[in-house]
Amino acid sequence: AMLRDLDTGIEAARFQSPEHGALELPVKLRVFDSVFVPLAKWAMLMAGNYRCVQAEEMRPIKDAVHGDLDASQAVYDWVVGVCIDLGGDISDFVPFEKYAKAASSLANPSSAARALAGGAKNIERVDKLVSLVAAQQGKHLEVVDETVAVVEKWLTQNRAA
């Protein structure tokens, strides 16, 4: 109940600007009945964001997803399966088709890819987390393993620079 009250309060809060009047805050708190809803992002991150990272350069999210739609769906569905095996329900996850449609308008590489290209020595490693969680379930997917290896290669190079 307390989190739902916070959600409602944040949604209703406005900042009073002398120039623009009441402005909506750029902060949201979403409360879900399932603890697995936040894990729904894992499939999106793995199918698109981390697959922006290539051996020599970065590619836009739309190319990472739509360059090989079958591979993207395989990664997406595999990650959803990992989450379901943790206890999630299929209704917690966005259908791949809806994600792929949204990804078609993402013309830039992901923030993780841009950070690596910019020389970052550390980034958030959802790719590695998903891989390790899946390995505990006895699961591996070659495309995911390759993605983790490429991200690791960039980090190693950046740390050596």
Regions from the language model: what does each represent?
Residues 1:
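Flavin (primarily FAD) cofactor-binding/catalytic cores of flavoenzymes
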Residues 4-161:
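NAD(P)-dependent Rossmann-like dehydrogenase/reductase catalytic/cofactor-binding core
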